Amino acid sequence: SATLGTTTVTKTSDETTDTVKGIFPTPRPVVTGDYVFSSKLSGTPGLGFPEGTSFGYQWQRDGKNIAGATAAEYDLTASDVGHDLRLRVRASLAGYTTDYTYAKAVEVQPLHFTATPEPTIDGILRVGGRLTSVPGDWQPTAAFTYVWYRNGKAIKAATKAGYTLTSSDLGKAITVRVRATLPGYQAVSRLSPPSVKVQSGLTSASAKLSD
């Protein structure tokens, strides 16, 4: 007779070890400074991060990264005015899951002109006379646009600093609206006092129109 032998096979499963990464606290970054054009903002990650944590910074405008704005400090520009700005902080450390936290988004405000004088009109108040708008001494210096008015109604195509009176202006009062702009500043419009009524016939007399 034959005896059949038996073979014992022992299988050992592969041992796997899952490493659980640490999780950072998630405090909001802290930003100091005024959200006003030309101001400097400074950001810090907030408290509670483990020793040795490294941080990366990214400033965002309306939720989109601002090119090159990757330092803890940021100087506000004219492009930021009227938009929401926030700081994103990236925290990284060996053994931890990389984390992103965000400061509260805040709308950036413009600066304001410190002097906004009422414009005046120089020129000859007769049909055919040439009028010139004098914006005055704005601070800081601004760029100006103009609209001329006849009895309170805008004159078509009269949008330059100078205006030549026509027969349509006869017997009417003339005013000019000056709009001042400067990047990063709130635009301001000022209206001149109305002139006396325009007379007929060009003469050599001239007058400065003001209050």
Question: Each predicted region: which residue ranges?
Answer:
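Ser/Thr/Pro/Gly-rich low-complexity disordered regions
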Residues: S1-D211
